[in-house]
Amino acid sequence: MIRTEHLSKRYESVTAVDDVSFEVRPGEVLGFLGPNGAGKTTTMRMLAGFVTPTAGKASICGHDVETEPLAAKERLGYLPEGAPSYGEMRVRRFLEFICDLRRLEGARRSARLDYVIEHLQLASVLEQSIETLSKGFRRRVGLAQAIIHDPPVLILDEPTDGLDPNQKFEVRALINEMARDKIIIISTHILEEVDAVCNRAIIIARGRIVADDTPLKLAARSRYYNAVSLQLERPDQLAAARAAVAALPSVADVEVSERDVRLTALPRSGAAILTAVAELASSKGLVLKELHLESGRLDEVFRSITA
């Protein structure tokens, strides 16, 4: 388990992290979200033992990060911001160096090297120096060093930063695979990543936790939760459709996009309006291209509570 208790970090007059407490248990993939400067990276550095807290404490698998640093770090895989490494080293030598530091030997060493090379698709760059790699490959090398010793806890700061869409998909699949028996914290500003791999999300703003829930429940706070979107075949029906939908008692507002010939009905207090809107469309003879029920928009919730 990862545990933080009243964790704070101050730099003279600036409070970067302010009284943060949470726990993460095995099987949880926690998305750590926040705007730039919110305190995400500072919190992760304190968890990883790279920054000393001003107050409070953090532990990894029961080992205090300050008083038992080696025991805590043995159980931790950490991908820092920017994926720093030794640029002059070849990729193969760097991974072997990490194996030495992690005291991996014999068959287990070979197996773990093979695992990270295969799953992060590093075979083609093993003999290149790290400084010559693209940003995406450097990120994958950084992730490889974090997981090579198969730790029970992973702390990953922007793990898909710099990756192309195919590489992002592969790394997210790997995270989902590892999530079965590990504790994983992912710091990200990519909200689609939270939907793709996380079963819990914490939002931090101005150094404090402002939300802690599942992505689905956070999205349900959105005014678009249970909203119904209709795309019409005929632009000439748009104005009448808007007026008819707006007159429904359970509809709070209607947004219109003339370019897409689309209207979105927003419910009052998250009410279920799909049936009423669908029946109205049928009774009014609206010719539809699409009828879509929204589950909420995490980006809108994020903006509303961090602004």
Report residues per predicted region:
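C-terminal coupling/interaction segments
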Residues: 268-307
